[in-house]
C-alpha cells in the first residue's frame, strides 16, 4: 500500500536555520513512524500541491498577523510573517475544499481557527517554554489521553472559536489547547507533539503523542 504524502508547511519565522532543520526532521520522522511520508513545502501553486499530496500538516512557527482576524497589532512581542500567512491560507483552503485531512500544530491550530473565521488573543503569559496538563474531551483522549502532560511554546492563543470548530482540550487556566472540526478531518493542537515522541524527543516525561500523526496518516 502506498504511503500517504503529507505536505508540511513551515515558514521563515521558526528560529535559526538549524532549528528549522531539526523541527522539519522531527515532523518527517513522526510521519514516517505513522506510515506517511513528509514533504516539506517550498512554495508553489496551492491547488497543485493539494492535488498531489494526501494531507496537510500546518507546522509551528511565528505569529499570525492580527489583520487576518480583523484586529490592529496590539502586542510588541509578535513575530509576523505575512507571506507565510498568505501561503498557508491558500494551502488550507485547497486541502480543506478537497476534504483532505489537516493537522495544525501550535501556530497551526491558530491558523486553522483564523482561516475559518475565528480570532486569537495576541499575547498571553505563562505558556512559553513550559509543560502543563490539559483536559481532553473523549474524542481527543483516544489519541492523547484524558489529561496528558504537554509542552507549551506559544504566546498567542485561540480566542473566539470559528463556528465550524469546537474546543477539544483546555489548559487549567481555560486556554483552548485543541480544536476539532464538526464534520471534516481537521484537528489542531496547541502543543508540539513531535517533541513528545520518545525516544526521538520527550518534553513531557512519559508522554507519547505519535497517535496524533497516525490520525493524520490514517485519514488519507
Where are these regions (language model features)?
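N-terminal beta1-alpha1 cap of cysteine-dependent amidohydrolase-like domains
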Residues: 1-105, 115, 121, 125-149, ...
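Conserved catalytic core of two-component histidine kinases
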Residues: 169
Amino acid at each position: 500500500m502506498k504511503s500517504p504524502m503529507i505536505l508540511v508547511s513551515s515558514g521563515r519565522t521558526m528560529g535559526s536555520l538549524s532549528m528549522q532543520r531539526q523541527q522539519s526532521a522531527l515532523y518527517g520522522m513522526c510521519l514516517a513512524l505513522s506510515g506517511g511520508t513528509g514533504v516539506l513545502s517550498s512554495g508553489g501553486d496551492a491547488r497543485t500541491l493539494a492535488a498531489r499530496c494526501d494531507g496537510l500538516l500546518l507546522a509551528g512557527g511565528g505569529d499570525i498577523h492580527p489583520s487576518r482576524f480583523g484586529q490592529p497589532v496590539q502586542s510588541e512581542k509578535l513575530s509576523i510573517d505575512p507571506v507565510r500567512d498568505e501561503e498557508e491560507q491558500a494551502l488550507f483552503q485547497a486541502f480543506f475544499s478537497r476534504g483532505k485531512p489537516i493537522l495544525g500544530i501550535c501556530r497551526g491550530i491558530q491558523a486553522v481557527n483564523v482561516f475559518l473565521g475565528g480570532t486569537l488573543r495576541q499575547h498571553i503569559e505563562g505558556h512559553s517554554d513550559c509543560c502543563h496538563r490539559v483536559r481532553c474531551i473523549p474524542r481527543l483522549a483516544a489519541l492523547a489521553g484524558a489529561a496528558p502532560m504537554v509542552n507549551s511554546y506559544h504566546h498567542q492563543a485561540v480566542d473566539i472559536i470559528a463556528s465550524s470548530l469546537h474546543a477539544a482540550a483546555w489548559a487549567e487556566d481555560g486556554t483552548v489547547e485543541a480544536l476539532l472540526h464538526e464534520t471534516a478531518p481537521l484537528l489542531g493542537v496547541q502543543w508540539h507533539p513531535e517533541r513528545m515522541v520518545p525516544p526521538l524527543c520527550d518534553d513531557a516525561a512519559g508522554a507519547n503523542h505519535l497517535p496524533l500523526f497516525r490520525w493524520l496518516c490514517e485519514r488519507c
